[in-house]
Amino acid sequence: VIRIFIRVGALVGTALLTACQSVPMGDPARSAELKKFAPNPNAGQIYVCRDDRFFGAAITPTVELNGKPVARLARSNYFFAELPPGDHTVVIKTLEHDSKFPFKIAAGQQTFFSTWISFGIIAGRGIIDTVTTEEGKKCVSSSELVGPIEAATAK
């Protein structure tokens, strides 16, 4: 019985280590520019930020915007997009759960989302919610911009 627990523990440990993948990073100069939080009068802007919480650190959820995968977020990372005014949907996808957040955005508006990993049955569940402008700017200011998801699959 003890051998079975040791083997299962080794498998779980290996799975956690292999799940701890890096994500493609964005341009540091662009990140510095985005952290000025200058609104675009012709488009809405969204920031999706994952803070540095330790729980779920090995999980890199996929961010989908309007049905298209656009980024993966590790701890202390954020994703940025400019969108035409109107209705949109952002989704955080993990192995076990899709967290969807439909929203409406206007030209010149900035919307901040926070994402984190909560407990799940098999793996952590990605959760997304809006945060205040102040909370969003604080998270983004202490995080790094991720690159597009295509950069991860091109390697």
Regions found by a protein language model. Name each.
Residues 1-20:
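Sec-dependent bacterial lipoprotein signal peptides
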Residues 20-155:
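Short loop/turn and low-complexity linker motifs enriched in small/turn-promoting residues
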